[in-house]
Design a protein with these regions (language model features):
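Periplasmic c-type cytochrome electron-transfer domains
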Residues: 1-212
Length: 212
C-alpha cells in the first residue's frame, strides 16, 4: 500500500508528522486540501489523496493491449517483431508486470560505465541516497514503459532525448553490446510506441518524444 511505501525507512525516512508538516508549509496547498479533507493534512488524508490521484494514472487499451487480447491488426508487423525482440533480449526481466516496470531497482552500469565522460552528481548515487548502503550505489527504480513515447526525456539524468537514444544506452550498459543493430533499434521503437494507452476512453495526450 501507499502507507507501507512511505513507512519504508530505506526509501522514505520521514514519518507522517514530518511529512504533514512539510506539506502544511505550502499554505495554498493546505487550503485546497481542507476543501476536500476538513481535518487537514494527516497520514490518512495524504494516502487517500495519493490513491485517488493514482486512479487517474490507469491508461488501458493501448494498441499492444488490444493485440494481446487477440486483435492481430492492432499493431504493425514491425511492432510485432519488436515485441519478439524485446522478449529475446530479456527486457521483460526488469520491465515486467502490467505496468511493464516500476517494480524493482536495478544497476545503471551493469555492463559498462554509464557515468563516463561527465562529472557525477549526488543523484547518480540512486537508491544509496535513501538506503545509505554502498551496495545500492547506482541502483535506480526501473520505470514503467506505459506511455513511454510521451514521457521523455529518459534515464534518471534525462540524458536520452529519444527512444533510440534510450535503447542505445540499454544496449551498452545493460546488455553489454558494443555494436548496435540499427534495424533492431527501429523494431524496438515500433513496439514501444504501441504502449500508449487511453484515459477516459480517449488516447493519452502529450508531447511525443523527438525522432532520432
Amino acid at each position: 500500500t501507499i502507507a507501507d511505501v512511505i513507512r519504508w525507512h530505506q526509501q522514505y525516512p520521514d514519518d507522517w508528522k514530518k511529512i504533514a508538516a512539510k506539506l502544511d508549509q505550502d499554505t495554498a496547498f493546505a487550503a485546497e486540501l481542507k476543501k476536500v479533507y476538513p481535518q487537514g493534512c494527516t497520514g490518512e488524508t495524504i494516502t487517500n489523496a495519493i490513491a485517488e490521484y493514482e486512479k487517474t494514472l490507469i491508461t488501458p487499451n493501448s494498441p499492444f493491449d488490444r493485440y494481446l487480447k487477440g486483435d492481430e491488426n492492432a499493431i504493425s508487423e514491425n511492432a510485432k517483431k519488436g515485441y519478439k525482440l524485446f522478449l529475446k533480449l530479456g527486457c521483460q526481466t526488469c520491465h515486467t508486470g502490467p505496468a511493464m516496470g516500476g517494480q524493482s531497482f536495478e544497476y545503471a552500469d551493469l555492463k559498462g560505465d554509464f557515468f563516463a565522460g561527465r562529472a557525477k552528481t549526488n543523484d547518480d548515487n540512486g537508491l544509496m541516497n535513501f538506503s545509505k548502503k554502498e551496495s545500492d550505489r547506482h541502483r535506480f527504480r526501473v520505470p514503467t514503459l506505459r506511455n513511454v513515447e510521451l514521457t521523455w526525456p529518459y534515464m534518471h539524468d534525462a540524458s536520452a532525448q529519444t527512444l533510440e537514444e534510450a535503447i542505445t544506452k540499454m544496449y551498452h550498459y545493460q546488455l553489454g553490446y558494443d555494436k548496435l543493430d540499427k534495424k533492431e533499434v527501429r523494431l524496438l521503437v515500433a513496439f514501444l510506441k504501441t504502449l500508449t494507452g487511453e484515459y477516459n476512453g480517449k488516447p493519452v495526450q502529450g508531447e511525443v518524444c523527438p525522432a532520432s
